[in-house]
């Protein structure tokens, strides 16, 4: 394989630029030509395919977002869209593609492979909801950003003796809420994978204040409900505390990636190129126990929930390849 391309698709994630950089420089070191596909699958169909060299990716490892830009393009799920994209790949002599994104992006990569263009998926999403990898590119940065914001909110929460409901991103996965909640010592962590009773949370808040507690921090995953709705239900259940709600929003998707995300993205990008050089496609790169691994894309993109709650109130990890997490210290809302 002499000529490959790289694209980013779906929601952006810190570390995508580091992955692109690794793909380009590893490919050059292997004697391959590299092209960048701008604006994801939409750009592929439109022919926004341009050559990249080592200088093209200079000084981008520390930048958030993706310099190739990204876009959601549901039309690529249809055969007509796929054939238009493939026509452009053939026009530019592309023989393989590295796709950086989430589960939707992976489906596109699988379609390319089925049409004879080996594609490798790299898990680029802050949600950490891709099966077959302990961590996704961008997750560590998003958790760190959420942690920093929650720490700041804790200061004002304590000053005014308030209860704060803080909504974090994650789509249908509770990973960001879980990790950021543990890291900040949240009083309650509410995630889609675990049930909760509003009256229990109200009782916990009340008991805390009666014992002299100055404030309460509730970290809420967006996949459960909005912070505004949760706050309203909390009041309806009898909460009488001075309540405020905050949605951290897209700040979690931006910013300079952490060292862990930069290294993870660099390792994954380089590994993807090595796979393409061997003619391998239809797989997603992951990390398990700090080692690079490959998994079939289709199964990776279509697995179900990562966590579930047992009848005894314990969280179990459905995906055996997710990183082990110490769950015993979580609050009563998870038990």
Swiss-Prot record:
Q: Pfam families of this UniProt entry? A: PFK
Ligand binding (ADP): 21-25, 154, 185-187, 213-215
Sites binding substrate sit at 125-127, 162, 169-171, 222, 244, 250-253
Binding-site list for Mg(2+) = 103
Instruction: Describe its assembly.
Output: Homotetramer.
Q: Name the family.
A: Belongs to the phosphofructokinase type A (PFKA) family. ATP-dependent PFK group I subfamily. Prokaryotic clade 'B1' sub-subfamily.
Pathway(s) per entry: Carbohydrate degradation; glycolysis; D-glyceraldehyde 3-phosphate and glycerone phosphate from D-glucose: step 3/4
Annotated active site residues, numbered on this chain, are 127
One Gene Ontology BP term is: fructose 1,6-bisphosphate metabolic process
Would you tell me the Gene Ontology cellular component terms?
A: 6-phosphofructokinase complex
Q: What is this protein called?
A: ATP-dependent 6-phosphofructokinase
Which organism does this sequence originate in? Streptococcus pneumoniae serotype 4 (strain ATCC BAA-334 / TIGR4)
| EC number(s) on file | 2.7.1.11
Which UniProt keyword terms apply here?
Answer: Allosteric enzyme, ATP-binding, Cytoplasm, Glycolysis, Kinase, Magnesium, Metal-binding, Nucleotide-binding, Transferase
Q: Which reaction does it catalyse?
A: beta-D-fructose 6-phosphate + ATP = beta-D-fructose 1,6-bisphosphate + ADP + H(+)
């Amino acid at each position: 394989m002499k000529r490959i391309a790289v694209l980013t698709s779906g929601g952006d994630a810190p570390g995508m630029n580091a992955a692109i950089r690794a793909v380009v420089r590893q490919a050059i070191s292997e004697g391959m030509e590299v092209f960048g596909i701008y604006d994801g699958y939409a750009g592929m169909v439109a022919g926004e395919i341009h050559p990249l060299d080592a200088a093209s990716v200079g000084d981008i490892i520390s930048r958030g977002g993706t310099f190739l830009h990204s876009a959601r393009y549901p039309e690529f799920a249809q055969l007509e869209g796929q054939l238009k994209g493939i026509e452009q790949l053939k026009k530019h002599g592309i023989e393989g593609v590295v796709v950086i994104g989430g589960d939707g992006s992976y489906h596109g990569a699988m379609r390319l492979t089925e049409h004879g263009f080996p594609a490798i998926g790299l898990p680029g999403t802050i949600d950490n909801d891709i099966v077959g990898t302990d961590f996704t590119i961008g997750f560590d940065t998003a958790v760190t950003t959420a942690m920093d914001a929650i720490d700041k909110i804790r200061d004002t929460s304590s000053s005014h003796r308030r209860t704060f409901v803080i909504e974090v991103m994650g789509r249908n996965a509770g990973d960001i809420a879980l990790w950021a909640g543990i890291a900040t010592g949240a009083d309650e962590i509410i995630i889609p994978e675990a049930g909760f009773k509003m009256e229990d949370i109200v009782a916990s808040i009340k008991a805390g204040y009666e014992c002299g507690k100055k404030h309460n921090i509730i970290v809420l995953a967006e996949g459960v409900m909005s912070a505004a709705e949760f706050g309203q239900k909390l009041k309806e259940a009898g909460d009488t505390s001075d309540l405020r709600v905050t949605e951290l929003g897209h700040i979690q998707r931006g910013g300079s990636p952490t060292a862990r995300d930069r290294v993870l993205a660099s390792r994954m990008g380089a590994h993807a190129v090595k796979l393409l050089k061997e003619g391998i496609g239809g797989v997603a790169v992951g990390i398990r126990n700090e080692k690079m691994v490959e998994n079939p894309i289709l199964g990776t993109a279509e697995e179900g929930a990562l966590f579930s709650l047992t009848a005894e109130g314990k969280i179990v990890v459905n995906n055996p390849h997710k990183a082990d997490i110490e769950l015993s210290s979580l609050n009563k809302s998870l038990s």
